[in-house]
């Protein structure tokens, strides 16, 4: 696996025996007001041994309102995202992916990746 760093370079995520890597997505950015950001990543096997990549996506129930957690915003740190249901969020990502042929990202995440080059 590789992740794209803030300079726009792909860096390896070396496998560590007995562990696994968890990628967080856009919902963590919304919940934490960008305290925890998703990383652009890709799965590559550059090793001579087999490597297993098992994507597993978890979303809240569709009617659940996704919004910044109370502990992640305040008077000098307003929420960066408008509240929306989980279904609205996922639908917007799927629609964007269909329009562009690229993975769906929130607008803020897409701009961050674009700025990195």
Segments the model singles out, each with a brief description of its role:
Residues 1-117:
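C-terminal flanking tails of non-heme Fe-dependent oxygenases
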